[in-house]
Curated annotation (Swiss-Prot):
Record has Thylakoid as a keyword: no
Family: Belongs to the OSW5 family.
Record key words, sorted: Membrane, Sporulation, Transmembrane, Transmembrane helix
Name this polypeptide is given: Outer spore wall protein 5
Predominant subcellular localization, coarse grouping: membrane
Keyword Nuclease tagged: no
Organism name: Lachancea thermotolerans (strain ATCC 56472 / CBS 6340 / NRRL Y-8284) (Yeast)
One Gene Ontology biological process: sporulation resulting in formation of a cellular spore
Cellular localisation: Membrane
CC annotations in GO: membrane
The protein's role, per its UniProt record: Involved in spore wall assembly.
Name of one Pfam family that matches: Osw5
Cytoplasmic side: 1, 48-129
């Protein structure tokens, strides 16, 4: 090997080492910072999962007690016979009827039949009605 080739090889090796040290000086702090934040994310995820499971367990333990308390309170209330309750289906039909009644006065009121009102015999309906 000649002196010139050894010198050029050492020059390339020196340049490589300088670039390596410079890149390491820039990348290593960023890599350490990234590792720190990634550890924080994993730790927060773990704590979030544990707190969720703890809250879910507390909820599951409290739900039967709450239901029994509400049922006991409801048992002490007198039934309201004078108030007519409207099912959501009937309320929706009522709203639809009033919506169409504003635009067209020929729309008929919907007929709502509950299960107890259905007759056991067949009713014949004529077309002229």
């Amino acid at each position: 090997m000649s002196f010139t080739s050894i010198f050029i090889a050492l020059l390339y090796l020196g340049g490589f080492l300088i670039i390596l040290v410079t890149a390491s000086a820039v990348i290593l702090p960023l890599l350490i910072t990234s590792l720190f934040f990634a550890t924080g994310v994993v730790l927060c995820g773990f704590l979030s999962n544990k707190s969720y499971k703890l809250a879910l367990r507390a909820y599951n333990l409290a739900t039967p007690h709450t239901r029994s308390s509400l049922q006991a309170a409801a048992d002490h209330l007198a039934p309201l016979d004078s108030v007519e309750t409207v099912s959501p289906k009937e309320e929706l039909l009522h709203k639809i009827h009033h919506f169409y009644k504003k635009s067209d006065s020929n729309v008929r009121t919907p007929i709502v039949v509950s299960g107890s009102e259905i007759p056991k015999s067949v009713i014949k309906v004529s077309e002229g009605t």
